[in-house]
């Protein structure tokens, strides 16, 4: 399939090794720089995969309305893809998420409906957004991408793992992969591609300590966008991972700031959580190993919030 416009630039992102954050006596830590995608987020991969798969099997008709619930980056990515392909897009989001993300969706032409949540990302917020998007689809006949239940989005991230295999052939081998999970699409797609070539890969899911449901804790309110949704992601099962790491919100924010100031990696809080987890794993493994994680998105999406204020 020929791809024109901005969607032709999705994927093929660079990978860099941390120079200072991990310290001495640790495994190498490598970061896939997904902010290099057109909207500054790895969600461009899943948005393109969901739309193109629906086009291919007829679920999405030319000019049909598309609807999605999103905290922002998926919405921005869908807005980009729909703009290039000529689909109107309606987004259900919330004021709990970064203003920059909402503005980006609208800049690409999406219609955005916001659900108020002054406390932040609460356990009930995502379910309420999901219900509203389902209502819109039922009322209008829109195609609902429904990211949490859409298996095509996992396929969109498989290429990320395949790219890593080509970029980091070793030695040393990639010993561990960690990723903050919302839909868990990036974790599932990338880890499956990596594990197919590296059967001993240690697979680590990352979540906020304030809503550590996968660790057996209660759902809670937090401010690390892109995950910690208050329940297990529908497509993520215990057999898919080897370990769960719960990163406190304050540490995720601190690590994101440190990465900007010491590594030149300018990102959001979810990347901070990824880096914190990767550093802990690297310290545990020691020299002779590689730990890989992902820069989720660009810090430009968070300049109006508390992260860099």
Language-model features: locations:
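PLP-dependent amino-acid enzyme catalytic core
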Residues: 1-309
């Amino acid at each position: 399939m020929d791809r024109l416009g901005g969607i032709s630039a999705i994927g093929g992102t660079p990978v860099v090794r941390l120079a200072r954050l991990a310290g001495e006596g640790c495994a190498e830590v490598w970061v896939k720089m997904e902010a290099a995608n057109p909207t500054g987020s790895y969600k461009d991969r899943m948005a393109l995969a969901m739309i193109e798969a629906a086009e291919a099997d007829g679920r999405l008709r030319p000019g049909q309305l598309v609807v999605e619930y999103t905290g922002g980056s998926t919405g921005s990515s869908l807005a980009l893809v729909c703009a290039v392909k000529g689909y109107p897009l309606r987004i259900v989001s919330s004021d709990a998420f970064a203003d920059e993300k909402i503005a980006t969706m609208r800049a690409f032409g999406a219609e955005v409906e916001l659900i108020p949540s002054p406390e932040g990302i609460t356990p009930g917020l995502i379910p309420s957004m999901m219900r509203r998007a389902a209502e819109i689809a039922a009322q209008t006949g829109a195609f609902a991408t429904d990211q949490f239940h859409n298996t095509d989005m996992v396929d969109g991230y498989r290429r990320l793992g395949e790219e890593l295999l080509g970029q980091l052939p070793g030695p040393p081998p990639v010993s561990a992969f960690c990723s903050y999970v919302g839909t868990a699409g990036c974790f599932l797609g990338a880890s499956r591609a990596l594990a197919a070539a590296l059967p001993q890969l240690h697979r680590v899911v990352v979540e906020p300590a304030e809503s550590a449901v996968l660790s057996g804790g209660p759902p809670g309110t937090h401010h690390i966008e892109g995950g910690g949704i208050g329940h297990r992601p529908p497509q993520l099962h215990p057999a898919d991972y080897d370990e769960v790491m719960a990163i406190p919100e304050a540490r995720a924010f601190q690590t994101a700031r440190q990465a900007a100031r010491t590594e030149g990696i300018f990102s959001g809080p979810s990347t901070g959580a990824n880096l914190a987890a990767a550093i802990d794993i690297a310290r545990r493994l020691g020299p002779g190993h590689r730990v890989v994680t992902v820069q989720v998105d660009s810090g430009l999406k968070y300049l109006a919030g508390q992260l860099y204020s």
